[in-house]
């Protein structure tokens, strides 16, 4: 009887194996394509025609509350008990390359080119020129930068930061009934 119990409890469901210790760049790109393409319900961006920087040069910086760490805030938001899983995503944040989003019709621009030519405060003028030359004058000097999304292990809650030149918004995206829902959980402004 005991042998049968051990055998049954050790049986794996191979169809559900996910490497929980790693959120790949490809997984992030697929997620971003899905949520950014939804310009009807989520409306994270106005259109695929808005310029997206290939790299966010702002640092991830959550607000720390007294006696409440950034990590505690994230664990609670993501409803994640595996603190190492979340902490590893934060600790390994680097300049997340969004270049592959170009394959899905997004306007990705190499901001290193702009930063090498002009001062930080002159970036909006350069972006306006690019938007005009791309046939998108309605966007003026608008562009966005995306931080690498931070997932919970189930991949049904994600913290996504969308940065603009002098401001940014943090969204908690939750997957319910195969659809993503957004909730604004933070913002910053210079």
Regions found by a protein language model. Give the residues of each.
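Sec-dependent signal peptide recognition
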Residues: 1-2
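C-terminal motif of bacterial Sec signal peptides marking the signal peptidase cleavage site
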Residues: 6-9
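Short beta-strand edge/turn micro-motifs at domain boundaries
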Residues: 170-190
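Flexible low-complexity loop/turn motifs enriched in small/helix-breaking residues
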Residues: 11-157
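Exposed beta-sheet edge and beta->alpha loop/turn motif
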Residues: 151-177
């Amino acid at each position: 009887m005991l042998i049968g119990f051990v055998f049954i409890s050790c049986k794996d469901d191979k169809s559900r194996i996910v490497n929980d210790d790693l959120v790949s760049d490809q997984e992030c790109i697929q997620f971003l394509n899905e949520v950014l393409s939804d310009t009807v319900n989520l409306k994270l961006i106005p259109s695929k025609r808005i310029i997206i920087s290939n790299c966010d040069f702002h640092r991830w910086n959550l607000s720390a509350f007294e006696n409440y760490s950034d990590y505690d805030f994230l664990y609670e938001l993501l409803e994640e008990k595996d603190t190492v899983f979340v902490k590893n995503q934060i600790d390994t944040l680097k300049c997340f390359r969004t270049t592959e989003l170009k394959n899905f019709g997004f306007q990705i621009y190499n901001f290193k080119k702009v930063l090498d030519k002009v001062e930080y405060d002159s970036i909006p003028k350069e972006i306006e020129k690019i938007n005009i030359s791309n046939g998108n004058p309605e966007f003026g000097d608008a562009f966005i930068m995306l931080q690498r999304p931070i997932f919970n292990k189930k991949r049904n809650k994600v913290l996504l930061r969308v940065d603009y030149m002098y401001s940014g918004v943090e969204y908690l995206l939750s997957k319910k009934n195969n659809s993503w829902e957004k909730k604004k959980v933070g913002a910053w402004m210079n």
